[in-house]
C-alpha cells in the first residue's frame, strides 16, 4: 500500500495518532473497545507526526472543484474527465487504489512544471481519512 502504517498511542486510553490502512473500526474490534482518531496531540510521539510532511515542494490546495492553467488537478472518482493536467487517484472510486496511487501521483506531478496542485475532495471515511491526513500534511 502507498500509505504508512496506522499509528496508535497505547500509553493511556488507546487513540489513533495517524490514520493508515488499518482503520479505527478494525482496531476497536481487536482491542474490544472504541478507539478514535485524535488530531489534538501537540507532542510528536512517533515518526511521521510532523505537521508538514510528505511535501512535493509545490503548493497544494485541498477540496478544489477545478484547477487553473499550469496547475495539476488530483481527483478521485468517476465524474472527472481525463484532461492533460488531471491525475485520477482512482477512477473506480476505490480508496484502496487511491491510497496506492497517492505518492506515485505526487512524485509524477513534482517532475512536471506545474505551479500548484489542486486536489478534489476525497471521502473522509475509512482509508480516506489516511489519504486526507497525508494530503493535509503535504499542503502545509
Predicted regions located by residue number:
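Active-site-adjacent structural elements in enzyme catalytic cores
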Residues: 1-140
Amino acid at each position: 500500500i502507498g500509505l504508512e502504517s496506522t499509528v496508535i498511542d497505547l500509553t493511556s486510553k488507546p487513540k489513533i495518532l495517524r490514520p493508515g490502512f488499518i482503520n479505527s473500526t478494525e482496531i476497536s474490534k481487536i482491542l474490544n473497545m472504541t478507539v478514535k482518531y485524535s488530531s489534538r496531540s501537540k507532542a510528536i510521539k512517533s515518526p511521521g507526526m510532523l505537521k508538514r510532511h510528505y511535501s512535493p515542494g509545490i503548493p497544494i490546495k485541498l477540496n478544489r472543484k477545478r484547477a487553473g492553467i499550469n496547475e495539476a488537478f488530483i481527483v478521485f472518482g468517476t465524474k472527472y474527465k481525463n484532461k492533460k493536467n488531471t491525475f485520477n487517484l482512482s477512477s473506480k472510486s476505490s480508496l484502496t487504489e487511491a491510497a496506492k496511487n497517492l505518492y506515485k501521483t505526487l512524485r509524477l506531478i513534482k517532475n512536471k512544471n506545474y505551479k500548484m496542485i489542486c486536489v478534489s475532495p476525497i471521502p473522509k471515511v475509512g482509508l480516506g481519512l489516511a489519504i486526507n491526513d497525508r494530503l493535509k500534511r503535504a499542503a502545509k
